[in-house]
Amino acid sequence: MKKWLMVQGTTSDAGKSVLVAGLCRVLARRGIQVCPFKPQNMALNSAVTPDGGEIGRAQAVQAQACGIAPSVHMNPVLLKPNSDTGAQVILQGRALSNMEANAYHDYKKVAMDTVMDSFQRLQQEYEAIMIEGAGSPAEINLRENDIANMGFAEKADVPVIIVADIDRGGVFAHLYGTLALLSESEQARVKGFVINRFRGDIGLLQSGLDWLEQKTGKPVIGVLPYLHGFDLEAEDAIAAQQNLSADRQLRVAVPVFTRISNHTDFDPLRLNPNIDFRYVGQGESLSGADLIILPGSKSTRADLAYLRSQGWDKEILRHLRLGGKVMGICGGFQMLGEWVHDPLGIEGEAGSSEGLGLFAMQTELTAEKRLTNVKGHLTLDGQTVAAQGYEIHAGHSSWAADQKSPIILSDGSLDGLVSDCNQGFGTYLHGIFDRPETALRICQWAGAKEIEAYDHRAAQERAIDRIADAIEQHLDLTLLWPDL
């Protein structure tokens, strides 16, 4: 029997992504061929598929939970915001164009055809598809032409469960109100509710569960407990959990840009118990770090201006004068050069922005985006380790032949730079910290001589298994699939 199920939420960050990942692992454990699917994702955290397409990182993690490679059809529409009112539209892994919100609202009727094409392809290949909604299905202003929630569920004729985060408070109002704002046909599609992140005695919640079931006629499929210390890649929001301690081997600071992209790059550092890691927000100081890392950006020139508005440029230069280390990834790497040129207005108004000048490097943004998974070797301080990652960038950086590139890729090409003073290191590779030995080598270069390696992939697997175990224990899955 085919198993299609869509997980929608009462709010953003209700637990949809994690619940889908857990359900994928539960079904995969039973030998069921399962895959994830999200019709439309709005996120600056993206992944590269084996065939060179771009999808949301959440779907890549969910594919990992299934034990399969990610595909562009698992997230056929990806929106990458590049301003408060606009985004780059990516269809089936390929960039289409930049659109303002009003233009995209009209375009969604066309995008639905792409969504259905991808979904139907997956239906032919898999026994089960776990589908993730976006935000809330009860956003009245977004109901017209909806492709992310009930608009898709109705078109594809799939059942829905609604999840809410009780840790935020107001869970019964969220669930009851969300259901009430749906049409009759949409309400009929809802098979039940899941309450997420509950702390305390479940007996004290029972009267509320009984009331909800009586008022709505829908079952509460289960109540998932609050999993202390649980951490699985955030879909887009910066993770609140940070590693702050005075006795760590290395202190790392990452400034949060207005259009920061792929901040999941830093999860292997943020979760490493040997590292004091902090994100630095608006009005905060970078001081006190051993290593400052400039992250990726969807709008490099705009975020370079933002960096200067925060006074971080002066702090970075002072940090270098005092012997500290600075690293840049993708857009952050571009910022460390001399100039970033955007003659075509790829990221906004055409023009050029002066970089921080750590590298004698010029970057020109171009319409063509490079999307690829790569492997190679990284050499820092004369020691070489295996390295891998993925590139997602528009533009090309050039530098003099006598400058040192620390990364040699498997095709013989070079990536990144190390400054003459050995205090700066830049690379285009997202995910460079995912391999334990690579992260260890970079941390040692930054001054942490006795730091221990941290296996982020193994930690991800433990987190996926943990949520799957909680689902097995606390959800009545026979309410969804009697034959399971």
Curated annotation (Swiss-Prot):
Coiled coil: none
Pathway: Cofactor biosynthesis; adenosylcobalamin biosynthesis
Active-site positions on this chain: C330, H430
UniProt xrefs under Gene3D superfamilies: 3.40.50.880, P-loop containing nucleotide triphosphate hydrolases
Residue ranges constituting the GATase cobBQ-type domain according to the UniProt record: 249-438
Pfam families, per the entry: CbiA, GATase_3
InterPro entries xrefs: Class_I_gatase-like, CobQ/CobB/MinD/ParA_Nub-bd_dom, CobQ_GATase1, CobQ_N, CobQ_synth, GATase_3, P-loop_NTPase
Origin: domain of life: Bacteria
Keywords: Cobalamin biosynthesis, Glutamine amidotransferase
A GO MF label: ABC-type vitamin B12 transporter activity
GO BP annotations, alphabetical order: cobalamin biosynthetic process
Keyword Cell wall biogenesis/degradation: no
Known function: Catalyzes amidations at positions B, D, E, and G on adenosylcobyrinic A,C-diamide. NH(2) groups are provided by glutamine, and one molecule of ATP is hydrogenolyzed for each amidation.
Protein family per UniProt: Belongs to the CobB/CobQ family. CobQ subfamily.
Protein name: Cobyric acid synthase
